[in-house]
Design a protein with these regions (language model features):
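Mg2+-dependent endonuclease catalytic cores in nucleic-acid-processing enzymes, primarily RNase H-like
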Residues: 1-104, 155-178
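Acidic two-metal-ion nuclease catalytic site recognized across multiple nuclease folds
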Residues: 93-178
């Protein structure tokens, strides 16, 4: 996994890496930090970021960090783009959400969504969707100086002469995904 992350850093000139701290992610985070790679550890089950609600009281809009970053991804997709990848599309549409009594959004657990979709005859890899959504766990402006809503991560003087395609080279960089 670390080798794949290093390839992607080189290919996309990534300045920061967000890694799921659950499961085997802790070891990946430790190794990347040993190599001097800036890493943000994301715990999907941790608390969501509070926002100012009515009467200037801070209140979480989401049940946990996972629901929050999936919600941020959903909002971005209204104006963003996805690679032509049916597996990713199915995975992003997989988990159901519901509103809890305290008016916070909760996503169906990864395990429950996978079980339900399998019973319905749909198989997909939820890790693919989590990989996209985890990119919304950090404020890209804060760490990269790049506004995530702009088309290119390049500075004006180093901007390429062709249109920026964030998915160019993706299949070559990650052949094991397809």
């Amino acid at each position: 996994v670390v080798d794949l992350v290093l390839k992607c850093i080189s290919l996309y000139r990534t300045r920061l890496v967000a890694v799921d701290g659950g499961g085997v992610g802790g070891g990946v985070i430790d190794r990347l930090r040993q190599l001097g790679i800036p890493v943000i550890e994301v715990q999907f089950g941790s608390k969501a970021t509070p926002h100012l609600a009515a009467h200037n009281r801070e209140k979480a809009r989401y049940f946990n960090k996972r629901a929050e970053i999936w919600g941020s991804c959903r909002d971005w997709l209204r104006g963003g783009a996805l690679p032509d990848d049916p597996q990713l599309l199915e995975a992003l549409c997989g988990p159901k959400q519901h509103i809890r009594s305290e008016d916070v959004v909760q996503l169906e657990s990864k395990e429950d969504a996978t079980d339900r979709m399998t019973r319905e005859g749909i198989t997909y890899d939820m890790d693919v969707a989590d990989a996209l959504c985890i990119t919304f766990a950090i404020d890209s402006d804060l760490y990269t100086g790049v506004n995530a809503l702009h088309n290119s991560p390049f500075d004006e003087e180093e901007s390429p002469s062709v249109d920026y395609n964030p998915f160019a080279g993706l299949r070559e960089a990650m052949p094991s995904v397809h």
